[in-house]
């Protein structure tokens, strides 16, 4: 199949990706944010679905997606112990862009996924702050870094380095081209498993 222009999830119109990476002697962690639309996504919800293969994760927001079939917030990725912080930051971001949330409308369902980066990162430091999420949102762009960045900073894969990757393909259906994009956070098996 033919690749998209950038071979990236951002080949899908409107999608941007941003990172905030924390790197030091003991910290290898971060936040990756997928902004799925330039519009107010709360007012202009996108059709969405989810499928869980590994039910061990602590992802937030998937139940409402499965129930209603829509996405109404950015999607963020981080480490396991930072899900709550990142979730609250996304709520604050959404409240800042839509003044009707919780007043004239219902509340907002934000989506945060995680992986345990404790093999390479001092996860107990709980170093991620709301400001790191806002920085990742500010950094969102069509062209974005891949590899050991953002939420991929502390990822490992069979004792090799994991990270963030992306790709896209063009598919033709009924003589019309469609772009399929993907963003992956590669993290498989820790050294002690």
Question: Where are the regions that the model predicts?
Answer:
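Alpha/propeptide regions of enzymes that mature by internal proteolysis
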Residues: 1-193
């Amino acid at each position: 199949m033919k690749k998209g222009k950038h071979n990236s999830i951002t080949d899908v119109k409107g999608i941007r990706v941003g990172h905030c990476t924390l790197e030091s002697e003991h910290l290898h962690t971060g936040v990756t944010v997928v902004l799925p639309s330039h519009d107010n996504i709360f007012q202009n919800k996108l059709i969405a679905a989810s499928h869980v293969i590994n039910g061990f994760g602590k992802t937030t927001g998937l139940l409402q997606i499965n129930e209603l079939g829509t996405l109404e917030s950015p999607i963020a990725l981080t480490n396991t112990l930072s899900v709550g912080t990142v979730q609250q930051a996304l709520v604050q971001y959404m409240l800042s862009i839509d003044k009707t949330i919780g007043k004239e409308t219902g509340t907002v369902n934000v989506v945060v996924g995680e992986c345990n980066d404790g093999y390479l990162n001092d996860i107990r430091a709980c170093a991620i702050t709301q400001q790191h999420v806002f920085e990742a949102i500010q950094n969102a762009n069509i062209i974005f870094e891949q590899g050991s960045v953002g939420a991929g900073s502390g990822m490992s894969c069979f004792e090799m380095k994991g990270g963030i990757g992306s790709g896209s393909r063009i598919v033709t259906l009924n003589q019309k081209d469609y772009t399929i994009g993907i963003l992956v956070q590669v993290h498989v098996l820790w050294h002690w498993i």
